[in-house]
Amino acid sequence: YQGMCYVTEHWERWIDIFQAMRDQRGAKRNDLWINLTCYVNPSPWFLQWGNSVWMQNSQDIGRLNVKRPSQLDQLLSYRDDRYFDFVKTRAFQFPLAHLYNHDPIYGNTANLAGKMDDDEFRTYLMMMATRGSAFWELYYSYNMMNEGQKWVINADVLHWINDNYETLKHAKLIGQTPAKGTPYGYSAWSGQEGIISVRNPSDEVKEFTFPLDRTIGMPEGLKGLHRTYVWAYRTDEQKAEDTENHLFDYGGQISLSLQPGEVRIWKFSTVPDKEAPALRIVKTTSPTSLTVELNEPVILKDGIFSVSGNEVTATSLSADRRVVTL
């Protein structure tokens, strides 16, 4: 009908090619990642042969200014709005883990040089990490990655994604599209652990309430969950609602007030994190300074470090949040 026989033959040939590519690899057939991009309908049917499919409803790069002109906010608001369009408006039944888009982007051609400081860059990567995407192409200009400590941040975030991917791959949208200026985020759960991100895309303080139930992917009946911070941007990490020592259960809800542009990312687990960070390396860098490397990220507080027989007059934290200079 109207030339559709050609389309059928076209894709049958491509499927034969995909199959031949995997067959040629023998026992390593599943080590090949096939990403289907231009002019491919985003149907889960293709996941029989490919691993990821371009979302198709989005430009390579786009900006959406919801009265927050920073590049961090415009880039996140644009792409996450496209996710809401894909999942909610078009109602495509497609696992987010296998959805491809052109993120992250930090390159000269995109006119982004000098447009994100280190905290913005980490927030950019961490927020998109909670989308659950399995396939990342890093659209970076190497000269721009020398700004601040972006190479270190990039490596740290990718390690975190790899360590938590069994949870992240189950990501679901929560809230409403950032195009409306309303809070939103992603929720991912696996077994007795979960990761939730929330973001306020607007220039106003917003209240956000969401349920802890199956609508956000939480396993039914899960109880006794401890919450810990993964990352926070434009927020006071000592806010009462995040430091109260109470547990979360299935059927409850989370309500919070988000500042303009604020991002919070939490991890939930039935097992409390009671183990203190451990020292990996301590070395002298000058007659009056030490570098301390820990095995996990830390938040600097007064009095947290002491050196026998010496006064600690200043501390600084590297971009990976694990290396402290005293």
Explain the meaning of each model-derived region:
Residues 1-5:
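Active-site groove signature of glycoside hydrolases
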Residues 14-245, 253-265:
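Active-site-proximal substrate-binding groove within the catalytic cores of carbohydrate-active enzymes
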Residues 237-248, 310-319:
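Low-complexity "stalk/linker" and mucin-like segments enriched in Ser/Thr/Pro/Ala/Gly
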Residues 282-286:
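Short, solvent-exposed loop/linker segments at the N-terminal edge
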Residues 288-299:
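A short glycine/threonine-centered beta-strand motif
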Residues 297-316:
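Short, surface-exposed alpha-helix to beta-strand junction/turn motifs within ectodomains of secreted
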Residues 320-325:
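Aromatic sugar-binding surface patches on proteins
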